[in-house]
Amino acid sequence: MQELNQIFNTIKDIAKEISEVIKYADLGYTTHENATGDTQLKLDVKSDEIITAKFKQLSCVKALISEEKEDELEINKNAKFIIAYDPLDGSSLVDVNFAVGSIFGIYEDEVKPENLIAAAYSIYGPRLELVIAEKKGALPKFYRLGKDGEFKFVKELELKEKGKLNATGATQKGWSQTHRNFINELFNEGYRLRYSGAMVSDLHQILLKGGGLFSYPATSDHPNGKLRVVFEVLPFAFIYENAKGATTDGKNQTLFDIKIEKIHQTTPCFFGSRDEISLLHKFYEQK
């Protein structure tokens, strides 16, 4: 646990540094693309550099996997923790001053769903906030940066059985009829649309408000979804399931049933309260 605490404390330091960089950084694009074909923002690259430099200082870190790196970066061959991360989720929204964040998954020895032992995310908005799921079976912990520059524990996060928020992503013209019917049912039941375009912000709102659904389905142009399994989807699945919520890819009972074949693999994904995920399964099983 001491080594994990070193990682958690490093994530806190990273969050504080990136939060400051965001305020004044150049928001322009580079001339490079990341491993999944997105043109990199200078802020993406800078955030990745900050995270890499911080984790290189820890002897317990075996390797790093980043959205902005083509391949796994080995740090200490004999260490046991692999950190997979999205350095700045929603970075294209910084220029309109929306909240964005960083996502971290901590794997032990090998990158497999069952080897994900902890996860965290930071959110850079009007306030700097952090959520850490320290271990399987424990409620995620919510922190907020205080006036003294240190993170203060606020509360543990637990989702209700049923929520009222509906954060629905992907281009609607590419939705399947099954997904369209499901989303229409949520709106017919009175769910409120809450979608910013930043995964961290939308999932954070559902967690803090107690429940609802975040969806990024398969579409006609992206049948395997767009969100990355290793450093976006599984870390949030770990957090949501430990907050007594549920997750799925629309086929499996949980996102942890996904088989990882490559580090930049994508998947359709759904996160939410148990009632919403149960309803989704009913619709998807009818197709």
Curated annotation (Swiss-Prot):
Query: Would the keyword Magnesium turn up in this protein's UniProt record?
Result: yes
What's an example of a GO molecular-function annotation for this chain?
A: fructose 1,6-bisphosphate 1-phosphatase activity
Q: According to its UniProt record, which cofactors does this protein need?
A: Mg(2+)
Which positions are annotated as binding Mg(2+) 2? 86, 89, 232
What is any one of the record's Gene Ontology cellular component terms?
Answer: cytosol
Binding residues annotated for substrate, in chain numbering:
89-92, 195, 226
Which pathway does UniProt place it in? Carbohydrate biosynthesis; gluconeogenesis
| Name of one Pfam family that matches | FBPase
Q: Which Gene3D superfamilies match?
A: 3.40.190.80, Fructose-1,6-Bisphosphatase, subunit A, domain 1
Q: How does the annotation summarize its subunit structure?
A: Homotetramer.
Q: Which PANTHER family does the record cross-reference, listed alphabetically?
A: FRUCTOSE-1,6-BISPHOSPHATASE-RELATED, SEDOHEPTULOSE-1,7-BISPHOSPHATASE, CHLOROPLASTIC
Protein's name in the database: Fructose-1,6-bisphosphatase class 1
Species in which this protein is naturally found = Campylobacter concisus (strain 13826)
